[in-house]
UniProtKB/Swiss-Prot annotation:
Entry keyword set: Amino-acid biosynthesis, Aromatic amino acid biosynthesis, Lyase
Intrachain disulfide bonds: none
Gene: aroQ
GO molecular function: 3-dehydroquinate dehydratase activity
Name this polypeptide is given: 3-dehydroquinate dehydratase
Reactions catalysed: 3-dehydroquinate = 3-dehydroshikimate + H2O
Positions contributing to substrate binding: 76, 82, 89, 103-104, 113
Organism: Rhodopseudomonas palustris (strain HaA2)
Length: 151
């Protein structure tokens, strides 16, 4: 049975494809989840993909990832990136390798988006690659944990 990673998406990411497409593109959350599932499988991993607009639910899933012995977490915390000490603490607490992802380049946007509480709890951060950032995050996570894409 393949090792599992969690791909967690935070608030408003359910609106991908329709919310500000000039910034976030036209890909939907279903497209993101399909890309993540396929990329994980190519690395011999299984992806559990979830989205919530609620901070506590995201924290519960981070804890569940530990309980289910997941080997990695990819997190797009959305707006919680800039405000949530609790998400930071959850990631630090579970001690699972994590990658922070953002569809847009947060550093080319409003100054309040330039700070991330998630970054210090993750071993890597990716932003500005569109949904391809998720693929890159999974490939980086696979390399970190010692699996790799199959040719």
């Amino acid at each position: 049975m393949p090792q599992t990673i969690y791909v967690l998406n935070g608030p408003n990411l359910n609106l991908l494809g329709t919310r500000e497409p000039a910034i976030y593109g036209h890909a939907t959350l279903a497209d993101v989840e399909r890309l993540c599932t396929e990329t994980a499988a190519s690395c011999g991993l299984s992806a559990v993909c979830r989205q919530s607009n609620h901070e506590g639910e995201l924290i519960d899933w981070i804890h569940q990832a530990r309980d289910e012995q997941a080997v990695g977490i990819v997190l797009n915390a959305g707006g919680y990136t800039h405000t949530s000490v609790a998400l930071h603490d959850a990631l630090v607490g579970v001690q699972i390798p994590a990658v922070e992802v953002h569809v847009s380049n947060v550093f080319a946007r409003d100054s309040f988006r330039h700070h991330s509480f998630i970054a210090k709890a993750a071993f890597a951060s990716l932003c500005g690659f569109g949904i391809d950032g998720y693929r890159l995050a999974i490939l980086g996570l696979a390399a970190k944990i010692g699996t790799s894409a199959k040719a």
